[in-house]
A protein has these predicted regions:
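Alpha-helical segment of the N-proximal tetratricopeptide repeat
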Residues: 45-72, 76
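Short, charge-rich amphipathic alpha-helical segments embedded
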Residues: 68-102
Length: 217
């Protein structure tokens, strides 16, 4: 019977929770968000810490900084499929959001490319060095990302531009609504009444899932 090991440096790519891993396995399911995902080969603490740092940065949408660390991992071990996959997630600005209907984590793209993810050299290297279990997940996620990208490009081409973009902070550090958000709401209604097309996230995106709202921004 395989024992489970907890590696404090290995975090969930979707929610950041600590993963409980079966020894010698290359995929794991997060006990916090329930997402099955690929995991890297951890040969030592240095590699584990690098993956953790890169993942933390990506979860904070600091994609360029995260990509630098994934490239550093590749420099240490060019057979790390997860490092190449991490680079892909950064190139496309992937963030995982919770679907309010299914409660599953789904990808949303903060960056757009006209090229298919499957044509990317880093994707090809991730597939090359992945085992069967990892390939299945990589290919499924890549397909989902490609569909999102197509949707983004379609919306971007067809959506009429906004006259005004209202940017504000919704909540403060304690989670309470900010005064700015109240003011933003008033400004939105005032400008809308005056005939302007206004982008105001709280209303413009209220019926959009995370993976769908990025094109409008």
């Amino acid at each position: 019977m395989k024992g489970k090991i907890k590696m404090s440096t290995l975090k969930c790519k979707m929610c950041g929770g600590t993963l409980e891993i079966n020894e010698n396995e290359t995929t794991a399911t997060c006990e916090y968000c329930g997402t099955e995902q690929t995991i890297p080969k951890i040969t030592d603490d240095v590699v584990g810490n690098l993956f953790n740092r890169a993942n933390t940065l990506r979860l904070k949408s600091e994609f360029d900084k995260a990509e630098e660390i994934y490239n550093k991992i590749v420099g240490l071990d060019n057979t790390q499929s997860e490092a190449y996959w991490g680079i892909i997630l950064c190139k496309y600005g992937i963030e995982y959001v919770e679907d309010p209907t299914t409660y599953k984590r789904v990808p949303t793209c903060h960056r757009t490319s006209y090229d298919a993810i499957t044509a990317d050299e880093d994707y090809k290297l991730a597939i090359q060095y992945a085992d069967i279990s990892q390939k299945i997940i990589y290919e499924a996620v890549a397909k989902a990302i490609d569909e999102i990208q197509k949707g983004i490009l379609t919306i971007s081409q067809n959506e009429k531009p906004y006259d005004v973009f209202i940017c504000y902070k919704e909540t403060d550090e304690s989670g309470k609504r900010t005064q700015d958000s109240v003011l933003a709401n008033d400004i939105y209604h005032q400008l809308t009444q005056e005939g302007f097309k206004v982008f105001y996230a709280a209303i413009t995106l209220e019926d959009k899932l995370g993976q769908e709202y990025e094109p409008y921004i």
